Amino acid sequence: MYTQTLYELSQEAERLLQLSRQQLQLLEKMPLSVPGDDAPQLALPWSQPNIAERHAMLNNELRKISRLEMVLAIVGTMKAGKSTTINAIVGTEVLPNRNRPMTALPTLIRHMPGQKEPVLHFSHVAPIDCLIQKLQQRLRDCDIKHLTDVLEIDKDMRALMQRIENGVAFEKYYLGAQPIFHCLKSLNDLVRLAKALDVDFPFSAYAAIEHIPVIEVEFVHLAGLESYPGQLTLLDTPGPNEAGQPHLQKMLNQQLARASAVLAVLDYTQLKSISDEEVREAILAVGQSVPLYVLVNKFDQQDRNSDDADQVRALISGTLMKGCITPQQIF
């Protein structure tokens, strides 16, 4: 009964999404302005970029419906504990932790029953390969002394630079926690190096969710449970302060808007900081289009003069989140 109802609802949702796509295709064929009575042209309230963005949104929803996939986007500042939270949900360490921004590109972590060892798929690696070729030439021509002045060159960065000089490309497939850690760390160091060498990182090539890296692994807490239709996927998003790249804010907003729900990880000790404010603004920009939840991390660092749990919920719900989330959605 439950499975049949779910199937019928998904079929109806898919029909409505396909109908919306057809309507957009009709809009694409219409002129962007029409003659007015007195004025030569009257602008219509849509544009080609707007239509393209709507197409991307509908395609993303169709992809989720076809897989019955629930995508929970997780957002937070660099030190709020976002990676730790994701690792806790998965039940094993699938994301590395370093004392620097670690999510240059959004990453999907998908529950895959029976997949005990994590595997990372990075099929859309071509833009990274092109970037490596550009960086290879820049490294040959650059002043290393100047580079060390603008970039912290630790052992990981030095290994990456050596890899670029040798022309070693990224793989499309990584099996096991350590190879995955190495890939993700290298991607983030690649962002830092590209910025230092004044080379544009191809963020736009990874705007579509089907192009970003995907980690597949069995979530420990879901192992052995009765099988139900559907799939749970976490989306690790770049925080607004990740990698010092302001234009990542647009990518963050797009990814949040396309998720099934959003979980914001806030640092209890930094609730009124600028960085946490940027996270809250990104969440508020989503509005009521997706369900919102908040996880307050590091609450154990309170002292006897600190607000209690109910006071913190009231602060976040009312003052910080401007009433767009109820205290019951704050944990």
Language-model features and meaning:
Residues 1-49:
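Charged, amphipathic alpha-helical linker segments immediately N-terminal to NTP-binding catalytic cores
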Residues 66-331:
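Globular "head" domains of long coiled-coil molecular machines
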Residues 53-66, 70:
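Pre-Walker A adenine-sensing motif
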